[in-house]
Amino acid sequence: MAVFHDEVEIEDFQYDEDSETYFYPCPCGDNFCITKEDLENGEDVATCPSCSLIIKVIYDKDQFTCGETVPAPSTNKELVKC
């Protein structure tokens, strides 16, 4: 079991759209970071690249769903393999 330095809500992070990464200040002077892809995959641990501290990210997993929603095919249509 990991020992977290803190628990921080995702709203308190800074978001960089170019890298799709969330950042939060670390006591060592660097930043904890976690990517949008990590959050979509259900990860909730942000790490600091400069020290061994980690924090737990508190967020609504439903807001970070991976992939797109595809409607189910109608039952009265024949499926054709492409």
Curated annotation (Swiss-Prot):
InterPro entries per the UniProt record, alphabetical: DPH3/4-like, DPH_MB_dom, DPH_MB_sf
GO molecular function: ferrous iron binding; iron chaperone activity
GO terms under biological process: negative regulation of protein secretion; protein histidyl modification to diphthamide; tRNA wobble base 5-methoxycarbonylmethyl-2-thiouridinylation
Stretches assigned to the DPH-type MB domain: 4-60
Top-rank taxon, per record: Eukaryota
Keywords: Cytoplasm, Iron, Metal-binding, Nucleus
Signal peptide range in chain numbering: none
Residues bound to Fe cation: 26, 28, 48, 51
Primary localization class, coarse: cytoplasm
Record GO cellular component, one term: protein-containing complex
Subcellular location: Cytoplasm; Nucleus
Pathway(s) where this gene product acts: Protein modification; peptidyl-diphthamide biosynthesis
Cofactor(s) the protein requires to work: Fe(2+)
Reaction catalysis annotation: [3Fe-4S](1+)-[protein] + Fe(2+)-[Dph3] = [3Fe-4S](0)-[protein] + Fe(3+)-[Dph3]; 2 [3Fe-4S](0)-[protein] + 2 Fe(2+)-[Dph3] + NADH = 2 [4Fe-4S](1+)-[protein] + 2 [Dph3] + NAD(+) + H(+)
Assembly and interaction partners: Component of the 2-(3-amino-3-carboxypropyl)histidine synthase complex composed of DPH1, DPH2, DPH3 and a NADH-dependent reductase. Interacts with SERGEF.
Membership in a protein family: Belongs to the DPH3 family.
Comment field on protein domains: The DPH-type metal-binding (MB) domain can also bind zinc. However, iron is the physiological binding partner as zinc binding impairs the protein electron donor function.
Biological function: Required for the first step of diphthamide biosynthesis, a post-translational modification of histidine which occurs in elongation factor 2. DPH1 and DPH2 transfer a 3-amino-3-carboxypropyl (ACP) group from S-adenosyl-L-methionine (SAM) to a histidine residue, the reaction is assisted by a reduction system comprising DPH3 and a NADH-dependent reductase. Acts as an electron donor to reduce the Fe-S cluster in DPH1-DPH2 keeping the [4Fe-4S] clusters in the active and reduced state.
The protein, known as: Diphthamide biosynthesis protein 3
